[in-house]
Amino acid sequence: MISKVNKYPISFVKVIFAYSLYIALVFNYPLLAKVHAMFEMYPHDSEFFEYFFLFLLALTILFLLAILFFIFGTRYLLKPFIFLLLINSAILAYYKKNYGVSVDEGIITSLFDSIIEKNYHEVYDLLTNELFVKIVITALIPALPLYFIKIQYPKLLKEYVIRLSYICGMLIVWIAIVASNYKDISLTVRANRYLNKDVIPLYSVSSLLNIIKHSLSFKSAYVQLDEQPSIYKPEEEMVGIVVVGETARADHFSLNGYSRKTNPKLEKQNLSNFNNAYSCGTLTKTSVPCMFYVGDYASFDVAKANQRANLLDIITASGVAVTWFNNNSGCKHVCDQVKTIDLTKIYSEEQYDEQLIIELDKILDNNKSKKTLLVLHSMGSHGPKYYKRYPKEFDKFQPSCKNNNPQECSKEELINAYDNTILYTDHFLDLLINKLKKQNKKSFLIYASDHGESLGEHGLYLHGVPIKFAPEEQIHIPFFIWFSELYKQDRSFTILDAKTKISHEHYPHTILDAMQVTSKYFKKEKSLLR
């Protein structure tokens, strides 16, 4: 019987160093190979230093892991802690290898939000057979010895002395090694600061600790920014539609010069298109709160933004009827104070974005408000299941990727599937514009994507690279405005030059300007209307 298995006694110190060495070398081998390739491309004056730096990098990861185990791996927690870290490392290594993604605070909180908000489809989309095989081979099998060993600990006081001694000893050794060649080491590290995000699992562990730290910090009371905003001609009817796009790239919109006709319908509409627009984040978790933020853009912080009124709150306070329609992963607290219609809770299965129009019609048909703002959070081009974002009749570009793992499709198949999502977005937005035309009122539509998407460039897939390291593909977004003829007849204005570099910072002020809402937080110089 399993309960009678003889367990081999072994010191807790040996267990800690054995698993620290395994994680440091097996899961971080790609990082070490990356650094080696870096030296081959940009050789150092001394070949000895190149190998010395590789040794130091591996030793640093080993020591940090061991210190982590010595601090948190107490006698009752060491085995489960090692097990969890192995599982965590296997998952991180899989996503780093397959998608080029480093799991940071943004991705972790986004994942937690998806679970809390019951947006399980986002989690399911990332689960693959290859991932489970990776977990079994690199985590579960190496964890088996933990069952067959009995970890030996000395008396409690002696155990603490041993733990402290090893921690101090490792720090002394590390400092001595670094001090022996500090100048070259510091120069190399400063020139490659991004490498820290590739360390598995330490970068994600530190990100998780930061999240815990922030969650335990004091939260200030909700701040109402502007209790008395006003609106121009409150008795006049006007309908505004704001579409929050998902994962759309500017360079895959034919509106922006893409060789394929991915926007055949929008090209026939009289749009004001901006082809040099950039997002403020690479995750919906960050971008959506940022898009509706009306404070100092340079000091934007998601946690602080959630504790103060946003664009929608100000517009609502001016007397406009605001409704948020969700077909995505939630509004990230932006719509907490306004009416919300959530398709993910109405329907048991994922819906195409056209379903948003059916729900929108119900509001417009029974609308008694003079001023209305409808915000649609679309599913857009959300990956990795691009093929599930559009009906079969929009599967125009062939062959298209039908795999949940984009890296397993050819480049042609992947781009075809992604372009089909843009083609469907074109159709969806065209339907909205035509619906506004039929309203025969002053109306407008503003569209901007929350962020872009990597399709294999530089070995990256999906999105989520920290903004300061993010490639062009993940931050260059489509952004356009449409105004009805009645709107243009009633109001004299010009539009900012299409080639001007803009960002999400212009988004909330443009919406305020389009709705003609006056607020002390409105910055005319940040509006795209002149």
Label the predicted regions.
Residues 199-202, 358-361, 401-445, 481, ...:
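A long, amphipathic alpha-helix that forms part
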Residues 178-402, 476, 503-504, 509-530:
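Active-site-proximal alpha/beta segments of enzymes that process anionic O-linked groups
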Residues 1-196:
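Transmembrane and membrane-interface helices of multi-pass
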Residues 45, 192-195, 299-301, 411-426, ...:
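Active-site rim elements
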Residues 232-233, 437, 469-472:
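Short secondary-structure boundary/capping segments
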Residues 391-413, 487-491:
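Flexible internal linker/loop segments at domain or repeat junctions
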Residues 257-261, 441-442, 446-487, 522-524:
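Histidine-centered active-site microenvironments of extracellular/periplasmic hydrolases
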Residues 71-80, 99, 103, 314, ...:
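Catalytic cores of PAPS-dependent sulfotransferases
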